[in-house]
């Protein structure tokens, strides 16, 4: 999975491209930790994410819980099978999807 970032005035956006699974979940966790060190408002753009596993979901919910109240994690452009997974697991309600 490739992760690119874009800084804006009040937000840092991470763009994910590929598959978020057991092998790549630690990569996202590290990228999110670094992002929240730089900015309190982080968006994760999933437009080019083809697949998400339970390991990837665990990273997103763990970071959401960790920053809740101290920062803001937004998930954007959730589509296709990734959206189906978010809805089936209830993560579409738990996470801040924009």
Predicted feature locations:
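Short acidic-hydrophobic, aromatic-tinged amphipathic segments that line or gate anion-handling sites
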Residues: 96-98
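STAS-typified acidic loop motif
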Residues: 4-28, 47
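Amphipathic alpha-helical interaction surfaces in cytosolic regulatory modules
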Residues: 22-94
């Amino acid at each position: 999975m490739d992760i690119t970032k874009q800084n804006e005035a009040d937000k840092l956006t991470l763009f994910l491209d590929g598959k978020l699974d057991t092998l790549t979940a630690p990569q996202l966790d590290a990228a999110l930790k670094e992002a929240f060190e730089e900015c309190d408002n982080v968006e994760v753009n999933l437009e080019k994410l083809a697949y998400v596993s339970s390991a990837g979901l665990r990273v997103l919910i763990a970071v959401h819980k960790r920053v809740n109240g101290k920062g803001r994690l937004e998930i954007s452009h959730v589509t296709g099978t990734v959206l189906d997974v978010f809805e089936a697991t209830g993560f579409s309600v738990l996470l801040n999807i924009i």
